[in-house]
Regions:
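Small-residue-enriched alpha-helical segments and adjacent helix-cap loops
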Residues: 2, 21-162, 174-175, 179, ...
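Short, flexible, solvent-exposed loop/turn segments with mixed acidic/basic and small polar residues
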Residues: 12-18, 48-54, 191-192, 229-239, ...
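Short beta-alpha connecting loops at secondary-structure transitions
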Residues: 166-170, 314, 369-373
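Short, structured segments at the rim of ligand-binding sites
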Residues: 34-37, 61, 198-209
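Terminal amphipathic helices with adjacent charged low-complexity linkers/tails
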Residues: 69, 193, 201-226
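A cross-taxonomic marker for long C-terminal extensions/tails that follow the last structured domain
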Residues: 184, 343-344, 371-377
């Protein structure tokens, strides 16, 4: 039984919204091949409204789905390798350091793939709710491991196990890391995750019982991730790498196809928080950057919208204001997330939250914010 509070959409459990149904495609680690990205673009164009939302965990959402589209959509997604197990649809939430394996950083893709395969192979873990998240960090951050339920931080040939964002005091060979993570997740299910609560931190006693079951004990909390990925070309390497940003986390089908066309054939796209898209390039960086900017994607941190994110706004029945139309930078808040209700869906971990409490009223940091619709538009 899924926890009552778990309302996260999937490919099989579509979420009703004002603009039609919403489906979420899980991309473990934020990794997606060129062929899969082309399939996602086709699904967005054929079944949805032609747009795609990048979530805070590096997954993607199709919006505006027509009634009755779920079965055909799921079948097509499965054919593209995007839905390996219907029973584990919501369980495959894995974040990963988005630059792993690039520029001399340690690779994580095989570890993420092994973890995903182990989740899908375990019937017990089908009970994990959509809010439960695994994280795999290469030591450079970017995986939001401090906010994860079960985390693995790789250090050379070893990996540290984290529970509810805290070290469990367990360091083990990388080859044994997946087994330890799965054991911790199974313990979480046994203790009530998926039935009474959706996150380990919400269990009675938090993560201590899970850590004990895993053979460890909770220690220091992991520090939050540092700076966001910078937009634009990264330091020289092979292949060249660009980071683009989806404005307010939303991509068009044309942007999907463009980013896919630039991808190096031996590489994968990596999706990250705040709508960041890491593209290992098959072409030179200068020409690619101009094409991305011309398509409307963010390509420079100097763009005033580079630190602005938003929920789905009036497309969601909970929203009380059109925050996507109102979203703009706020002085003194370099990273700001506009939310149409108190849930604050899609907020990056490092963003300040401005919440609409009515069509023209907002809270920023819990305090009334003097913003008028005319001023914000």
């Amino acid at each position: 039984m899924q926890a009552a509070a778990d309302a996260c959409p999937g490919m099989l459990d579509l979420h009703p919204a004002r603009d039609g149904a919403v489906a979420r495609i899980r991309l473990p680690g934020g990794y997606v091949t060129g062929l899969q990205w082309a399939a996602v673009a086709a699904l967005a164009g054929e079944f949805g409204d032609g747009n795609l939302d990048v979530t805070a965990r590096g997954n993607v959402q199709l919006r505006g789905l027509r009634p009755g589209a779920g079965t055909s959509l799921a079948s097509r997604a499965a054919q593209a390798g995007l839905l390996p197990s219907g029973a584990h649809d919501r369980a495959r939430n894995i974040t990963a350091s988005p630059l792993s394996g690039l520029g001399g950083r340690p690779p994580l893709r095989r570890l993420v793939q092994a973890l995903d395969a182990a989740i899908v192979a375990d019937p017990v873990l089908a009970a994990l709710p959509g809010r439960f998240v695994f994280a795999v960090d290469d030591g450079t951050g970017g995986a939001a491991i401090a906010r994860s339920d079960v985390g693995l931080r790789r250090t050379g040939r070893q990996a540290e196990l984290l529970i509810a964002g805290c070290s469990a005091g367990i360091l083990l060979p990388v080859r044994a890391a997946v087994t330890a993570a799965i054991a911790a997740a199974r313990a979480a299910v046994r203790l009530g995750v998926g039935t009474s609560v959706t996150r380990i931190r919400d269990l009675p006693g938090g993560g201590h019982a899970v850590a004990t079951a895993a053979g460890g004990a909770l220690r220091a909390a992991a520090p939050p991730d540092g700076a966001r990925l910078p937009l634009g070309a990264l330091a020289a390497g092979e292949p060249a790498v660009l980071v683009a940003g989806a404005r307010l986390g939303r991509l068009t089908v044309a942007q999907l196809r463009l980013t896919g066309s630039l991808l190096h054939p031996a590489e994968v796209l990596r999706l990250a928080a705040a709508g960041r898209i890491v593209i290992p390039l098959a072409v030179t960086a200068a020409g690619a950057l101009a094409r991305l900017a011309g398509s409307g994607l963010l390509t420079s941190d100097e763009d005033t919208m580079s630190g602005v994110t938003s929920c789905s706004g009036m497309a969601c029945s909970r929203s009380v204001a059109d925050v996507r139309a109102l979203a703009r930078p706020m002085p003194g808040h370099p990273r700001i997330h506009w939310a149409g209700c108190a849930r604050g869906c899609g907020a990056p971990a490092d963003a300040d939250l401005i919440v609409a409490t009515g069509p023209g009223s907002f809270l920023l940091g819990g305090q009334p914010a003097a913003i008028t619709i005319a001023e914000a538009s």
